[in-house]
From Swiss-Prot:
Xref: InterPro entries: GAF (IPR003018), GAF-like_dom_sf (IPR029016), HATPase_C_sf (IPR036890), His_kinase_dom (IPR005467), HisK_dim/P_dom (IPR003661), PAS (IPR000014), PAS-like_dom_sf (IPR035965), PAS_2 (IPR013654)
Listed Polar residues bias regions: 25-55
Protein name listed in UniProt: Phytochrome D
PTM notes: Contains one covalently linked phytochromobilin chromophore.
Source organism: Arabidopsis thaliana
Highest classification ranks of the organism: Eukaryota, Viridiplantae, Streptophyta, Embryophyta, Tracheophyta
Amino acid sequence: MVSGGGSKTSGGEAASSGHRRSRHTSAAEQAQSSANKALRSQNQQPQNHGGGTESTNKAIQQYTVDARLHAVFEQSGESGKSFDYSQSLKTAPYDSSVPEQQITAYLSRIQRGGYTQPFGCLIAVEESTFTIIGYSENAREMLGLMSQSVPSIEDKSEVLTIGTDLRSLFKSSSYLLLERAFVAREITLLNPIWIHSNNTGKPFYAILHRVDVGILIDLEPARTEDPALSIAGAVQSQKLAVRAISHLQSLPSGDIKLLCDTVVESVRDLTGYDRVMVYKFHEDEHGEVVAESKRNDLEPYIGLHYPATDIPQASRFLFKQNRVRMIVDCYASPVRVVQDDRLTQFICLVGSTLRAPHGCHAQYMTNMGSIASLAMAVIINGNEEDGNGVNTGGRNSMRLWGLVVCHHTSARCIPFPLRYACEFLMQAFGLQLNMELQLALQVSEKRVLRMQTLLCDMLLRDSPAGIVTQRPSIMDLVKCNGAAFLYQGKYYPLGVTPTDSQINDIVEWLVANHSDSTGLSTDSLGDAGYPRAAALGDAVCGMAVACITKRDFLFWFRSHTEKEIKWGGAKHHPEDKDDGQRMNPRSSFQTFLEVVKSRCQPWETAEMDAIHSLQLILRDSFKESEAMDSKAAAAGAVQPHGDDMVQQGMQEIGAVAREMVRLIETATVPIFAVDIDGCINGWNAKIAELTGLSVEDAMGKSLVRELIYKEYKETVDRLLSCALKGDEGKNVEVKLKTFGSELQGKAMFVVVNACSSKDYLNNIVGVCFVGQDVTGHKIVMDKFINIQGDYKAIIHSPNPLIPPIFAADENTCCLEWNTAMEKLTGWPRSEVIGKLLVREVFGSYCRLKGPDALTKFMIVLHNAIGGQDTDKFPFPFFDRKGEFIQALLTLNKRVSIDGKIIGAFCFLQIPSPELQQALEVQRRQESEYFSRRKELAYIFQVIKNPLSGLRFTNSLLEDMDLNEDQKQLLETSVSCEKQISKIVGDMDVKSIDDGSFLLERTEFFIGNVTNAVVSQVMLVVRERNLQLIRNIPTEVKSMAVYGDQIRLQQVLAEFLLSIVRYAPMEGSVELHLCPTLNQMADGFSAVRLEFRMACAGEGVPPEKVQDMFHSSRWTSPEGLGLSVCRKILKLMNGGVQYIREFERSYFLIVIELPVPLMMMMPSS
């Protein structure tokens, strides 16, 4: 189905053994080493049912199947029998072992086949001596080295042979280019090199790459003899690719199908192939055509699925090494590679475009009517983990998501520049696809989290069986055909599930064979070893199970895959018989359906994570249920532990915040901040120095109206508006006014990052701007862009105000490289002028961080040449010494006198170390903040279970025969339990600030409130050996009022606890309550309650009191608690003061509450 030079059974290389000692590790060695190590350890590792290990195990199993099929194909060729692909695949067991020698030989045949395609020729060279050690047999003819007439006696011996110096075959200008390429660190970045044959002058694209024995050179005939035209053609191909990339980037997000449909249309427009498809690899390694663009008369393949063996693992590995694979003519006879007898094995052709397809694949292409093909790898971030769960990163973390495959019904050859442009397009497609997959994953995770929350709420409200018997249910957690819950011996099935007897049999099998596992997932119960899988039929093929306790299990079931497969093209008529011995798309499709007949869709890693999370939640819930009494007794200890964690977290965040403030105040970069009204509330010393406006004078001024130039007001307004909504802008240029006699009338330019300032409730309360002074840079750049004469004196000036500048012509060749660029990169101007900026200058000389960075740079450079400027583009690279440089790149079009665009100017801006340090501190602070928020969310979640235990225990006590004292203690316990529930439910406390905080209005007795408040401080009172003096009139305790009892007791308890904490040891604390009855205007009565909480000495520290009255800043958890309680009290029409008198201090709390009509109040 897919052309990769190795699809179906192999990639087509002949085998040999042994290695010559070399300086480079070949891709063949990497593949053989990794496969052999994996196969040796396969039987030593326990089965894993999710994540990267399972995917690796499947790939390892696939290697063995591929090798076995390859052996069958080879044997059929030797015996003269036809190769029945479908039958061979059906009879190839996945679990049988293959000798390691057979795997090694198979991989060697794939990668070291010894044959090339005839559309070009190949030469292998020893790197240090330029001595030829191998060449394809058609090289002499292509280079014009074979005599066209009868040779005479004077004829010299053949020029091209083993041991010939490569430089003698090409013109002097060509071999100079080759010599320079041979010493390059990244030789592939210089491809293609334009060279000419010494004999005929015929031009070639030389495509170089290193292998274990030297350097391999693919020579492809070029279509023009003018190298300038070749460069222009390459640039034109890149422009077409950039146009296609821009189209991809303009698509709406959230639609992967639209992205795939668009890329096949773009590739078909770019290359002209008859059919272009996107071929996706699923987690179980099988493939599917998910998008297609074709000629109208061709049969559609969209919707077809294919077995994993259609594209062997070895071929997939090759696609990660050489991302573009072209087959020009499957009918063409392959050309043998002649090589030095001293080489102990065939030359590795992994990186060669000329590598010949294996006979099996050529046969497959012939059967499907495809003569030529082009296959391009789609690579995304794989986030692969090692056995310890650690992300390995690097190149190995890139995953082959699929292929973009082109087919043509006649021979077709795409020149290297166009293939390279297609590779750029694939890199951009991979980046865009990766973002879409991440977005889809986030949406899925949010849905799962929302579902888990609903299921957890069910667990708290009802019995555990509610997650099956109610909606939503566990079936809504992951995609499945049925689900079940085996709880305390009772079976709760949903959808398509086994019967009671069958589920009991499955449980017995699990206990007997997987007793040491907490769960199991499989796409085939039969393959997993369940002996009675056949009795379940096609309805139940796959299963995921989570073990909650030894007798309680959660199950999810899926039916066989064939039910999920839909044919997306023309219907296959029943009378059209497929020939199983002829390999073609339909027979592959039927073979796939046979292979997956007893399999379900594989369980994805995200689905298993969701199941595992629910398993952990249920386990905790069941443990709480089994030990309810002990948990209830220990419940009082949960909240203090939570407070300790919160306090520790708050102290750490406070320390980071103080460090951040210190850095801001002493930073050598301009930093300023505004509140939600746009008025200055932060102004560091550097911005004061640059603007001439002191900190005192700046405070309170409007940023937009008083400090910004008129032409920038709209930009700053938009930046502020977005930042106050949480959308933080970056690298925005702002023009500030200056003050003072020395700076009067001068403008200051600063490039800022806008950071939303948030309070402890995560509410946005302002915006902080971290800037970089670019006044000198801006002035020089403006002059430089507008100048119309000799500008060299400006850009090559050693003045430090001159930024690093380089320029490109319309073919992306380096036209300018100023002194600042020489100093920054270490590369002199003479070495880069005339070189291609993409791949040569930035790529080979100044290395970028991977191919994705190169793709992005190519896009913005071509955009600038096309008239679209780019401002402050992140552009990190490595200088000549290998040191990493972080820079921002601004690109502007170059315009001739007559207004024609003739290239691009590029300006680099290097952020100062102070700015980078400030941003790093900000990132650490945000990371710490979100980490603590997660911990708090976890505490709030897990505390609900012991609260349920408390509520249950209290409800049991209420039904008992209690005396009056016991009833009062029970009422106090219930009030405290309700208070905790209220606090735990206050995750969205921003409503306290905006006034939308909901207060209840119920009738309650004041005595119940004071009893609950006092009970919450008694432990601290005893610890500090204090005496608590209560002066509360007896008649007030029995007084009934209207209001929010729980919130009132929360507020009073917080204030009283603060007094108790800071009262002198062995001293006393006083609690006075003085009521006053008032007649309201509407005829109703209200009581004014005045609480006085006092102790000797200073009492609560001044900083805690300041925290209480500050709306957004606090230094401790206690200050935060006091501030929140003050706000709640204010919403209840109350108020608080902290008063210090001679030798005593106290809180004075006043609140007025309505009194029921029938309540009489004695005069105070």
